[in-house]
Amino acid sequence: MIDENNDVSEEALSSDIKKLKEKHDMLDKEISQLIAEGYRVIELEKHISLLHEYNDIKDVSQMLLGKLAVTRGVTTKELYPDFDLNLND
């Protein structure tokens, strides 16, 4: 906790450290489980990178569809069939 003088209590710091250690342990267990299932760290990093790229492209696409919808005076949803897009995607 931070008091009026911007001082952090030792108790608050200890609590934060404990929570971080617990999170670290949990993540270590998840990594070990993924490795046991046959995943490799490099593959996971590549997959995460590709997901970020996909999300960036999707965000730009949604922005462009929104601008086109405004120009045409329709909703974005109404444009999906024009571009063979899945409404659930």
Swiss-Prot record:
It is found in: Nucleus. The lineage of its organism: Eukaryota, Metazoa, Chordata, Craniata, Vertebrata. The keyword Flavoprotein does not apply. One of its GO terms (cellular component) is nucleus. Keywords: Coiled coil, DNA damage, DNA repair, Nucleus, Phosphoprotein. InterPro entries: DNA-repair_Swi5. Its main location: nucleus. Component of the SWI5-SFR1 complex. Interacts with RAD51. The keyword Magnesium does not apply. Residues 10-38 form a coiled coil. The gene is Swi5. This is DNA repair protein SWI5 homolog. It comes from Mus musculus (Mouse). Belongs to the SWI5/SAE3 family. Component of the SWI5-SFR1 complex, a complex required for double-strand break repair via homologous recombination. One of its GO terms (biological process) is cellular response to ionizing radiation.
